[in-house]
């Protein structure tokens, strides 16, 4: 598929930041990774469902690329945020789908997000940028695994302005 970036100039060339993106299909991480790695030469670290790390080949790739497994229940819930915190302190990019799963809305409206991305930004002082993406649902159905005809359709990835957290940073 063809990624069409809009607003990429808003992202810092150096230093850590957090990207928060909507999550429509299983192609979304590839679109964001393309945007940051190919366009900016920065490899993002995604927080990803732990089950993906158990899939042969895919799990090995995720681990080798420094992606962060998220355990959805149990005592290890703070482990992903600690790992993300360490990457941010080292100047890396973290990408998070704050909904924690694929959007369930048939109209693809975002669901309520979790607070981890903002907590990371407040704890580390790094900027947060919203990412809106659309078009991947024309290539891969929302919960599907079979590509639709026209694989080379565009996937639009829009980078928004930095989220202003100054009022919240003052409270800390």
Named regions from a protein language model:
Residues 42-43, 65, 90, 124-128:
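Short glycine-/polar-rich loops that comprise or flank the Walker A/P-loop
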Residues 3, 79, 112-116:
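Short, conserved clusters of charged catalytic residues that mark active-site
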Residues 11, 58, 93, 107-171:
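A cross-family acyltransferase "interaction/gating" segment
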Residues 13-74:
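Catalytic core of membrane glycerolipid acyltransferases/transacylases, capturing the structured
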Residues 1, 70-75, 106-108:
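Short, flexible loop segments at the rims of nucleotide/cofactor-binding pockets, characterized by
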Residues 68-82, 88-89:
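Helix-adjacent hinge/juxtasegments
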Residues 16-18, 93-97:
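Residue-level preference for the first positions of well-ordered beta-strands
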């Amino acid at each position: 598929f063809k990624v069409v970036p809009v607003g990429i100039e808003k992202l810092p060339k150096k230093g850590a930041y957090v990207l928060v993106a909507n999550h429509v299909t299983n192609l979304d991480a590839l679109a964001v990774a393309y945007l940051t790695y190919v366009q900016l030469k920065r490899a993002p670290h995604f927080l990803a469902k732990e089950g993906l790390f158990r899939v042969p080949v895919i799990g090995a790739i995720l681990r080798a690329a420094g992606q962060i497994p998220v355990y959805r229940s149990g005592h290890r819930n703070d482990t992903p945020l600690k790992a993300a915190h360490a990457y941010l302190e080292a100047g890396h990019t973290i990408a998070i789908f704050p909904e924690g799963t694929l959007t369930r809305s048939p109209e693809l409206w975002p669901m309520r997000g979790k607070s981890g991305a903002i907590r990371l930004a407040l704890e580390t002082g790094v900027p947060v940028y919203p990412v809106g993406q659309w078009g991947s649902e024309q290539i891969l159905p929302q919960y599907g695994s079979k590509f639709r005809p026209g694989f080379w359709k565009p996937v639009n990835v829009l980078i928004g302005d930095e989220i202003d957290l100054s009022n919240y940073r003052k409270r800390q």
